[in-house]
Design a protein with these regions (language model features):
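C-terminal peripheral helix-coil segments that are non-catalytic and often amphipathic
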Residues: 1-38, 171, 175, 203-276, ...
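Short, basic, alpha-helical segments at the C-terminal edge of helix-turn-helix-like DNA-binding modules
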Residues: 101-109, 303-304, 332-341
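Long compositionally biased, domain-poor regions of proteins
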Residues: 56, 64, 134, 138, ...
Length: 480
């Protein structure tokens, strides 16, 4: 299917870091300053210009180093405004981020929605919307990077804004699938589709390959439109799966409890271990303590003294293993991802003779791992985005390894199915988005019940809906 471009054209961002606002290469005085003396501008026009430059600086710096590493000093120097001017306009950097995000998300949602409603059928509407988004991403890659990744690590208000934007897009697609937004709260299809599209887009934006998205719009549309408009019987609402976004459930484990589960494994006291075993134990305790603290307080609340105290090691021992708290975080992230991939691979390989059964076993094992290791799951799938670009690179490498188990699906696909080349990558993104959803909303205890539906959504583009549904029902029956 060839994507038809929408009739609308993406509007140029008034406050994006475009060439007409810059001079020279990236540097300390990148954005133009107002002329000194009489310039004929009203106070309102001056403030509008200053706000625009600060938003542009925030967009650029987040794309470069991530939100936690952005300082107000960096913002004022890059935007060419004074600190007093900054604080006259914004209370803090979070308020500036929210302002930039609202501008980008509002324009993006409006542009994509306009393209979507111009289609004559669901398949065409979705593809037109993807083309519209790809055009914006190519025109404003740094702004789109902020929209997809920049809110992580910025606090609950930023995540709340992001969730509202995601829900608006989900509702648009859900309505286009000729379904009531509230009629089937257990259907994860729309979240899965949004996750796949977001993953493909975010990866290319972060890697400086935004121009590829326009060419991929048709493939993503074909992938998304391969899913039937209704879930097969026996999957919708089965095993008590819920996809709602109404916050933590009454039985969800709070952050402190997630941390204590990890902390409870930490040994202490005298021992007769060899030096190598001691070092291994210390490293494991530091990793587990890091995951426990981040589960409770987030990356921003992570401190070396608390890591050392909970891990029952000295500060000197900590520094022998990790130079900074960021390195400890990356160490914990690698351990969590390695464990998740290991249990997935072992389950997959045990049933590899029948690829679809191996995938089902792997997804079931992955969801079981997430449920049993809530602190590590939260760190690797949620907190990673707000830590640093290095953490996101580690995540992308792990996701690429996970995608490798899906690629044989192209070979196993029936002759009548021609899955687009982007399918494996998009499906992997969809799986991780659903995991992210359950973890973020403190619903990990329900995730194992979602495994059959995840299996169906994973297999459908490769095997078709019949075998995908049969495999998913078999998994659901085995858990009864």
């Amino acid at each position: 299917m060839t994507a038809r471009k929408p009739n609308t054209k993406p509007g140029k961002a008034k406050n994006s870091s475009s060439q007409d606002e810059t001079s020279g290469s990236n540097g300390g005085t990148r954005y133009r300053r107002l002329p000194t003396g009489a310039h004929g501008l009203t106070r309102e026009e001056v403030e509008l210009d200053q706000r625009g430059r600060l938003r542009s600086a925030m967009i650029e710096l987040i794309a470069e180093r991530g939100y936690p590493a952005v300082r107000i000093l960096d913002l004022t120097q890059l935007a060419h405004v004074s600190r007093p001017t900054f604080y006259n306009l914004y209370a803090d950097k979070e308020e500036l981020l929210l302002s930039a995000y609202e501008d980008i998300a509002g324009r993006t949602t409006a542009h994509v929605a306009e393209a979507y409603v111009s289609g004559e059928a669901q398949a065409q509407s979705l593809e037109l919307a993807l083309v519209a988004f790809a055009e914006l991403a190519a025109a404003e890659p740094e702004a789109m990077t902020l929209a997809l990744l920049g809110t992580f690590g910025a606090g609950p208000r930023a995540l709340s804004r992001r969730n509202r934007t995601t829900q608006a897009l989900e509702q648009m697609i859900q309505t286009g699938r000729e379904r009531s937004w509230s009629e089937h709260p257990a259907d994860l299809t729309t979240k899965f589709l949004i996750g796949g599209i977001r993953e493909v887009s975010a990866t290319r934006l972060r890697q400086g390959r935004a121009e590829e998205l326009l060419a991929l719009a048709g493939e993503l549309g074909d992938w998304a439109n391969s899913y039937p408009q209704t879930l097969p019987l026996g999957l919708e609402g089965s095993r008590r799966v819920q996809a709602r976004d109404d916050g933590p459930s009454a039985t969800a484990a709070p952050a402190a409890a997630r941390g204590r589960r990890v902390e409870g494994r930490l040994p202490s006291g005298r021992h007769d271990l060899a030096r190598e075993e001691v070092v291994k134990s210390q490293r494991e305790r530091i990793v587990d303590a890091t995951a426990a603290i981040v589960a409770e307080k987030g990356f921003a609340g992570l401190t070396i003294p608390e890591i050392a105290s909970r891990a029952n090691v000295s500060h000197e021992t900590f520094y022998e293993m990790y130079p900074t708290k960021h390195d400890a975080f990356l160490g914990a992230q690698k351990v969590g991802l390695h464990q998740a991939l290991r249990v997935t691979a072992e389950a997959y390989e045990a049933r590899e003779a029948e690829w679809h059964e191996g995938v089902a076993a792997g997804i079931d094992a992955l969801t079981e791992f997430v449920c049993s290791e809530p602190a590590h799951a939260h760190l690797t799938l949620i907190d990673t985005f707000g830590a640093s670009p290095a953490a996101i690179e580690i995540r992308e490498s792990a996701l690429e390894a996970f995608t490798g188990y899906l690629r044989p699906g192209f070979e196993h696909a029936p002759a009548q199915i021609d899955a687009p080349e982007i399918t494996a990558e998009a499906v992997a993104g969809g799986i991780w988005q659903v995991l992210h959803h359950y973890i973020e909303h403190e619903r990990m205890h329900e995730l194992c019940d979602a495994a059959p539906q995840l299996v169906y959504l994973t297999l459908n583009p490769f095997t078709g809906p019949e075998l995908a549904a049969e495999t998913a029902r078999s998994l659901a029956a085995s858990a009864q």
